[in-house]
Amino acid sequence: MSSSQNNNSSWIDWFLGIKGNQFLCRVPTDYVQDTFNQMGLEYFSEILDVILKPVIDSSSGLLYGDEKKWYGMIHARYIRSERGLIAMHRKYMRGDFGSCPNISCDRQNTLPVGVSAVWGKSTVKIHCPRCKSNFHPKSDTQLDGAMFGPSFPDIFFSMLPNLTSPLDDPRT
């Protein structure tokens, strides 16, 4: 973390600004602080202090090393909430996650997906709702797939009924 970084920015601001992390959406502070959303996550009180306070020099020894995992697991929960789905919907409609490389899908927008909900099993993939295939993203991202989970695309389309899933397109 650079010392020239704005002192009012948090670890979250810094983390979301890293190249390759553009698939992630900002999890609001109130969601992060809600103890219900932290259930089952280890060391949440210590890590919560780090990710919400203004960024400090990482050489100070106040970073635990699990911040990325902790934020990723909170993110996976958040994107299943109403507010999280709205944030991901905006990114989907803008094409932030890329498009399907399959020519027959006609550059269909994709969604991020993890092949496992277990941390450390695989990096994030992109899922095409038209051909139902998963692909490696073109962007330079090494995000863990657990930050999205294997069911995110299904949840996304089932919770946003105003979207017609390309799977329902009679032309396919």
Curated annotation (Swiss-Prot):
GO terms for cellular component: cytoplasm; protein kinase CK2 complex. Induction: In wild-type flies, it is strongly down-regulated by double-stranded RNA (dsRNA) interference mediated by Su(Ste) transcripts. In males lacking the Y chromosome, the absence of Su(Ste) locus, relieves such down-regulation, explaining why it is strongly expressed. SMART domains: CK_II_beta. GO terms for molecular function: protein kinase regulator activity. InterPro entries: Casein_kin_II_reg-sub_N (IPR016149), Casein_kinase_II_beta-like (IPR035991), Casein_kinase_II_reg-sub (IPR000704). Probably not expressed in wild-type flies. In males lacking the Y chromosome, it is testis-specific and constitutes the main component of star-shaped crystals. PROSITE patterns: CK2_BETA. It comes from the Eukaryota. Belongs to the casein kinase 2 subunit beta family. Interacts in vitro with the casein kinase 2 alpha subunit (CkII-alpha). The relevance of such interaction is however unclear in vivo. There are multiple copies of the stellate gene in fruit fly, encoding proteins that are extremely similar, which makes their individual characterization difficult. Thus, most experiments probably do not discriminate between the different members. PANTHER family: CASEIN KINASE II SUBUNIT BETA. Unknown. In males lacking the Y chromosome, its strong overexpression leads to the appearance of proteinaceous star-shaped crystals in the primary spermatocytes causing meiotic drive, possibly by interfering with normal casein kinase 2 activity. This is Stellate orphon protein at 12D. It comes from Drosophila melanogaster. The lineage of its organism: Eukaryota, Metazoa, Ecdysozoa, Arthropoda, Hexapoda.
